[in-house]
Amino acid sequence: MISKQTMTYAALSALCLVSNATFAKINDDIDLSGYIMLDYNKFDSSLLEGQYNSSDSESTSEIRRARLSFKSDISKNWKSKFQLGFADGETEIKDAYLEYSGWKYADLTIGQQKEGFGLEKLTSSRKLLMLERSMISEAFSPGRSLGISLSGDIASVNWQLGYYEPDEDEATSAITGRVAWVPWQQNTNLLHLGVAFSERQYDGNEFRVNEPLEVYTADSLIEGDKINADSLSQQGIELLWLKDRFTMMAEWQKAQVTSIENTTNDYEGGYLQFGYQLSGGYRKYKNAKLGASSEPGWEITGRYSLLKLKQENQDAKTYSLGVNYTVNKNIKFMADYIKADYFEAGGTITSGNAISLRLQYSF
């Protein structure tokens, strides 16, 4: 097994070479971009722990995300990306990788990158239909990890397969893969079908589901058992349909966690969401990922989402409606209404409502 320290040194060495090679040229070789998201949330106090029967409400405002990215084309076949993330008073490296595209059937990516799992998780936060991703995407779709991956396109099939060493708080190693197929496409209209898997080793590290009900500043009411996990096995299926102004996407995911005592906990969930461009235009699509609106204007959105913790006997559902207004390529406004229901064995159904607003500025 490749050690995480070795992979870290390799990635940092590669980035140093990238920096030297790039700055030896001219500054125009570096593409600097970024964005900032300012959020306001107002929600029932029932979405806070210990306030299940309260009729009060809470309101919060925050910088939800701020990102700064540096991209560089080093040569014909080599390029790099380095992205910093700023949120919750902390700074972290989001992306730090090199990509080689000189082979005919596959591209090679080395460094900190997104694992290939989950249509919604792979969609940039700037291009989401709703302010927040669904519960299942946040709970189980892997995010960014240090690793090495191969990806490519063969006819109408896009694929990615990688070996990763995530943060030790999540897993010690993982093999993750995704295949997406477009069986039908006419101009910008298309049907996308995808499957993905991830086999993750925990080696006794703690695993726990701990998620809010799609309201970022509310409490994490979905709290599963604390498990000293040996491994996690997860699978997902995905669908995306783009038809003129209309967008529909859906996913279903299952996960099984095996403890070091050889007991298992099962989880599953999914979502169905839509978007409709009132002002014309359509949603873009590239590399098996959903893109931004093609034109400025209004978009209405909606989502039904659920998450089930089987052994813990907990269920959560959300119903959301939203409206987005894209002013231009730099400025976007978003507003969502969320109704959330939560049930735990031995208790009653807890419900809450929320309004979430966002101002997004990109450069």
Give the residues covered by each predicted segment:
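Cleavable N-terminal export/targeting peptides
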Residues: 1-27
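Outer membrane beta-barrel
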Residues: 25-45, 49-203, 271, 276-293, ...
